A protein has these predicted regions:
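Short, Lys/Arg-enriched N-terminal segments with co-localized hydrophobic residues
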Residues: 1-5
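Conserved positions within compact, well-structured domain cores
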Residues: 23-192
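Sec-dependent N-terminal signal peptides
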Residues: 8-19
């Protein structure tokens, strides 16, 4: 009887530890500039915003200039606007920080599975395993494109007047590219 009770207790402990490790560590941050509440998540050892920034600045827009798209997808920012958009205590991630983020996800899930693991469960048919909740907010170049199909994020790293963007798009890749600084992408802020 004693051993059966110990076995049951040990099973509960193992289950609790497994759940604690598997579930993302989440929180909420309130942006004092406009009162907007953002979900946060710890990935690796870093705290990220778990949704796209929706703070209005010059050189930021809603997809198709529709306010309801800002509410659903966050704002799209030029590179210069993105560099200034994060609240105090947060920053636009550098390429190295995005690379470490990508490596953490791919080392945990594999390159192909990372695509599904990052995508939103309810807005993009993914598993959102890490609570990062990537949504297909599209982008703006000369026109608005990719809504419902792709996600694009700025890094703070620039080169020769252009800047690095990180792109999650079909067929299932999360890749970095150097892009015109006038493009408009989503912003995810990283806690300092």
């Amino acid at each position: 009887m004693y051993f059966r009770g110990m076995k049951l207790a040990l099973s509960f402990i193992v289950l609790f530890v497994a759940l604690a490790v598997a579930l993302p560590q989440t929180g909420v941050f309130v942006d004092n500039r406009d009162g907007h509440k953002y979900r946060t998540v710890v990935i690796g050892s870093k705290t990220w915003m778990a949704e796209n920034l929706d703070y209005k600045t010059d050189e930021s827009e809603c997809y198709d200039d529709k306010a309801e798209n800002c509410k659903k997808y966050g704002r799209l920012y030029t590179f210069e606007a993105a560099r200034k958009a994060c609240p105090v205590g947060w920053h636009l991630p550098e390429n190295d920080e995005w690379s470490r983020f990508k490596n953490f996800i791919e080392n945990s899930d594999g390159k192909e599975a990372a695509w599904v693991s990052l995508k939103s469960r309810d807005k993009w048919d993914g598993s959102d395993r890490y609570g990062f909740d990537v949504i297909p907010a599209g982008r703006a170049t000369d026109e608005f494109v990719g809504l419902g199909e792709s996600a694009h994020f700025w890094s703070s790293t620039d080169e020769d007047g252009d800047a690095y963007g990180w792109h999650l798009m079909p067929p299932g890749d999360f890749a970095r590219d150097i892009d015109p600084a006038t493009n408009m992408y989503s912003v995810r802020c990283l806690r300092n």
